[in-house]
UniProtKB/Swiss-Prot annotation:
Entry's Gene Ontology BP terms: negative regulation of signal transduction by p53 class mediator
Entry comment describing in which tissues the protein is expressed: Expressed in testis (at protein level).
Pfam families per the UniProt record, alphabetical: MORN (PF02493)
MORN repeat coordinates: 38-60, 62-84, 91-113, 114-136, 137-159, 160-182, 184-205
Region (Interaction with MDM2), start-end ranges: 6-35
GO cellular component, one term: acrosomal vesicle
Organism superkingdom: Eukaryota
Ranges where the record places region Interaction with SIRT1: 76-100
UniProt xrefs under SMART domains: MORN (SM00698)
Region ranges (Interaction with TP53): 206-240
Record-level Gene Ontology MF annotations: protein-macromolecule adaptor activity
Location in or out of the cell: Cytoplasmic vesicle, Secretory vesicle, Acrosome
Organism: Mus musculus (Mouse)
This protein's name: MORN repeat-containing protein 3
Upper classification of the organism: Eukaryota, Metazoa, Chordata, Craniata, Vertebrata
Length: 241
């Protein structure tokens, strides 16, 4: 009686190739078709865990946390300096879904940087900005601009404390002219002081005091006059139709 043998099941070669191509755990270096390369941890064929990504075209380098193929967690981004070619750190902080989110520091230049909160790659929340000209802004941000309460301290020591909107002084605020020994308190519209009061403030200690002190207000109801002017500014009369 003939003996029948069942053929041994052989795994197709492509299955082995596919299994070897699946990236999980630590890989020393993986290159993309465009020349980008990544060194670090993988999960389910996606960058996941700690890793370093280098973009060939821009030369940018990211070192930090990844989650399912996106920068997520804490990490640093560096770009090559256009003059020296050396890597220069441009951001260190938290990421979410491949975007800057949470607390982080962004370097715009050698002396210009921002430290504070981010949301979707924009400065949003509380933050402090150091400008190249020596000015410093500290306060609230929204959509990458000062928005809400904040203080701008100028290089010469003068400062504004008050409300900001769309990156400009808008609303109630106080401007300390410490170089001249005066204080203005009032209402701003798009960086222009519209109405308010000016008083002497630390005039005796000011480096460049005004020639004469501010005279006493002689009108009967200065507060009422100021309130009336402010009301008109806040609620302009409707144009006659």
């Amino acid at each position: 009686m003939p003996v029948t043998k069942c053929p041994r099941k052989v795994e197709p070669p492509w299955k082995g190739w596919d299994r070897k191509a699946q990236k999980n755990g630590l890989r020393h270096q993986v290159f993309a078709v465009n020349g980008d390369h990544y060194v670090g941890e993988w999960k389910g064929n996606l960058k996941h865990g700690k890793g370093t990504q280098v973009w060939k075209k821009s030369g940018a380098v990211y070192e930090g946390d990844w989650k399912f193929g996106k920068r997520d967690g804490y990490g640093s981004l560096s770009h090559p300096d256009p003059e020296t070619g050396k890597l220069r750190r441009v951001y260190s902080g938290w990421w979410k879904g491949d975007k800057k989110s949470g607390y982080g520091i962004q370097f715009f230049g050698p002396k210009e940087y921002y430290e504070g909160e981010w949301c979707n790659n924009q400065r949003s929340g509380w933050g402090r900005m150091y400008y190249n000209n020596g000015d410093i802004y500290e306060g609230q941000w929204q959509n990458d601009k000062p928005e809400g309460e904040g203080m701008l301290r100028l290089k010469n020591g003068n400062r504004y404390e008050g409300i900001w909107e769309r990156g400009m002084k808008n609303g109630h605020g106080r401007f300390f002219h410490l170089d001249h020994g005066q204080l203005f308190e009032g209402y701003w519209v798009d960086n222009v002081a519209k109405c308010g009061t000016m008083i002497d403030f630390g005039r005796d200690e000011a480096p460049e005091p005004t020639q004469f002190p501010i005279p006493k207000v002689e009108i009967l109801d200065p507060d009422g006059v100021l309130k009336e002017a402010l009301d008109k500014l806040m609620k302009p009369e409707e144009e006659e139709g």
